[in-house]
Amino acid sequence: MISFSSFYQQIADSNLQHWLETLPSILGKWQRDHKHGNLPKWEKVLNKLHYPAPDQVDFIDSVTVGSGEQLSPGEKEKLENLLRLFMPWRKGPFHIHGIHIDTEWRSDWKWDRVKQHISPLKNRTVLDVGCGSGYHMWRMLGSGAKRVVGIDPSPLFLCQFEAVKRLAGTHHPVHLLPLGIEELPPLDAFDTVFSMGVLYHRRSPIDHLLQLRDQLRTGGELVLETLVIDGDENAVLVPQDRYGKMNNVWFIPSVAALMLWLKKCDFTDIRCVDTDVTALAEQRRTDWMPNESLVEYLDPNDITKTVEGYPAPKRATIIAVKNQPNQDLIS
């Protein structure tokens, strides 16, 4: 069974220690709720990942574990077969002992767009909301973060993350907890909070922004990346049914509307640092994710539109700072 005890020990004497009042019981319930289904099968695969400590790691320019020279061809083939049992791999890529996990998303491209605009992560405590399998968490660690905590309720993402961590070394201060943000108390503790690719999946985007704010210390930085549309501060797309074949997209605001929402939620120093139309090469079908991908979500006759006729995915990155608490918002 995946254990979170090392995380509990690490935060026991930190500014996250009050989280221990509720976290163990919440995660214990999550484990009991997932005693059946795929999790036990994936945990058996994790228990087979017994390999020597890697001769090198790189989290600065990529997520690379091992040079590729440590394992024999047979050992490498066995490892690849084990890692393929965690398919589909959506966020990456990862380079593990010479094995290239070519994920659906080129998450490194997103990181390259974001990293130049954020405050330096050196010695920061970081929260990554909706972290997927943890690719960006490793890059945050490579940027000097003191501790990185990711939350994502998916059992598969947790097991993919655990696979990489067990191969990279469990001593690294990066942790994935299978939680949604609504399960977090107001921690007011993180120096930087990332929410990338989450906001449009939330039924109440304002509540999501307030939940993000509640995790930051005063003066902490929010890095928000989400789908946007063109338009003024009153422009918000509410898909009638599906958007890009996704049935869980609720609100897609314009950049101006999103910045207004952040201001209303008592953020300050709000700025849009990047907008980017998602390229077909950034999200695509691969050998490690053989299902439908972006090209199938777009109109085959006009890739500037989704199959439903909405504007094709365009993403913006907004950076904002948590202001002093506003008692009107708290109440």
Curated annotation (Swiss-Prot):
Keyword tRNA processing carried by entry: yes
Catalytic activity: carboxy-S-adenosyl-L-methionine + 5-hydroxyuridine(34) in tRNA = 5-carboxymethoxyuridine(34) in tRNA + S-adenosyl-L-homocysteine + H(+)
Alphabetized InterPro entries for the sequence: CmoB, Mo5U34_MeTrfas-like, SAM-dependent_MTases_sf
Residues that, per the record, bind carboxy-S-adenosyl-L-methionine: K91, W105, K110, G130, D152, P153, S154, I181, E182, M196, Y200, R315
Pfam families: Methyltransf_9 (PF08003)
CDD domains the record matches: AdoMet_MTases
EC number(s) from the headed UniProt entry: 2.5.1.-
One GO-annotated biological process of the protein: tRNA wobble uridine modification
S-S bonds: none
UniProt GO molecular function: methyltransferase activity; transferase activity, transferring alkyl or aryl (other than methyl) groups
Enzyme class: transferase
Keyword vocabulary terms for this entry: Transferase, tRNA processing
Quaternary state and interactors: Homotetramer.
Biological function: Catalyzes carboxymethyl transfer from carboxy-S-adenosyl-L-methionine (Cx-SAM) to 5-hydroxyuridine (ho5U) to form 5-carboxymethoxyuridine (cmo5U) at position 34 in tRNAs.
Family listed: Belongs to the class I-like SAM-binding methyltransferase superfamily. CmoB family.
Protein's UniProt name: tRNA U34 carboxymethyltransferase
Organism: Shewanella baltica (strain OS155 / ATCC BAA-1091)
Upper taxonomic lineage: Bacteria, Pseudomonadati, Pseudomonadota, Gammaproteobacteria, Alteromonadales
Gene: cmoB
